[in-house]
Amino acid sequence: MNDAIEFVRDIRHCAEPWTWNLLQEDGEITYSPDRDARTGWIRYKCKTAKAFTEVLKTLEYCRGCFCGDNGYTRRFGLRGCINTKEDSEALTVTAYYGYVRL
């Protein structure tokens, strides 16, 4: 698993949006944002290695990207925080985003 993470971190382009959408439609990617905006954890369950790779590629691409949000700038991506877990059903990627005061 660590090899996969290191490989994906070397990829500098975003996953094609249509690929992500197809994976979601097929149920290969499901995600559950933490409803508590103070913590900002999002868990992505990936049922295939392809889905896992697409999630990591996209998160890596989005790291450092900013968008305005209620007087704050929301920073998406890893911020050095990524956990992976493998169980009988899926690979789970837990990513973190935070808020930076404008």
Region spans (language model):
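Short intrinsically disordered terminal tails
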Residues: M1-D3, Y99-L102
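N-terminal leader/targeting segments
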Residues: M1-P33
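Mixed-charge, Lys/Arg-enriched low-complexity segments
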Residues: R9-D10, A95-R101
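Acidic, low-complexity, intrinsically disordered interaction modules
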Residues: T30-Y96
